[in-house]
């Protein structure tokens, strides 16, 4: 793909001092040189910047995942316990309703997170169903 016998000149003059076209230049610029390696340097700098940015994002993402994973696992265990107890108690209507309300998309709604994206300590829907299960258990022990 590359050309054979291609060797870029390190510096190339855009115009010559001998050129009369630029003698009347208002700014009186000296020769302007273009570094043939400038594009390569710029590409390496850009890639280095992008690599650094990606690395920082990955570590930040991993940190966020590590913090949120335990909260998510705790919530998942609570939901599983609620559904398991309702199923074991034979409360099929409550079980059906709980599966709808405790759907992952619903319990992870943004309204249950604070401004720092931390889950509220007492998730209102999970707490509601824990109370319902407790009532069903109490009713079952009385019967």
UniProtKB/Swiss-Prot annotation:
<dbReference type="GO" id="GO:0097361">
    <property type="term" value="C:cytosolic [4Fe-4S] assembly targeting complex"/>
</dbReference>
<dbReference type="GO" id="GO:0030674">
    <property type="term" value="F:protein-macromolecule adaptor activity"/>
</dbReference>
<dbReference type="InterPro" id="IPR019191">
    <property type="entry name" value="Essential_protein_Yae1_N"/>
</dbReference>
<dbReference type="GO" id="GO:0062092">
    <property type="term" value="C:Yae1-Lto1 complex"/>
</dbReference>
<dbReference type="GO" id="GO:0005634">
    <property type="term" value="C:nucleus"/>
</dbReference>
<dbReference type="InterPro" id="IPR038881">
    <property type="entry name" value="Yae1-like"/>
</dbReference>
<dbReference type="Pfam" id="PF09811">
    <property type="entry name" value="Yae1_N"/>
</dbReference>
<feature type="region of interest" description="deca-GX3 motif; required for interaction with LTO1">
    <location>
        <begin position="48"/>
        <end position="88"/>
    </location>
</feature>
<comment type="function">
    <text>The complex LTO1:YAE1 may function as a target specific adapter that probably recruits apo-RPLI1 to the cytosolic iron-sulfur protein assembly (CIA) complex machinery. May be required for biogenesis of the large ribosomal subunit and initiation of translation.</text>
</comment>
<comment type="similarity">
    <text>Belongs to the YAE1 family.</text>
</comment>
<keyword id="KW-0963">Cytoplasm</keyword>
<dbReference type="GO" id="GO:0051604">
    <property type="term" value="P:protein maturation"/>
</dbReference>
<feature type="region of interest" description="Disordered">
    <location>
        <begin position="1"/>
        <end position="20"/>
    </location>
</feature>
<keyword id="KW-0539">Nucleus</keyword>
<comment type="subunit">
    <text>May form a complex with LTO1.</text>
</comment>
<protein>
    <recommendedName>
        <fullName>Protein YAE1</fullName>
    </recommendedName>
</protein>
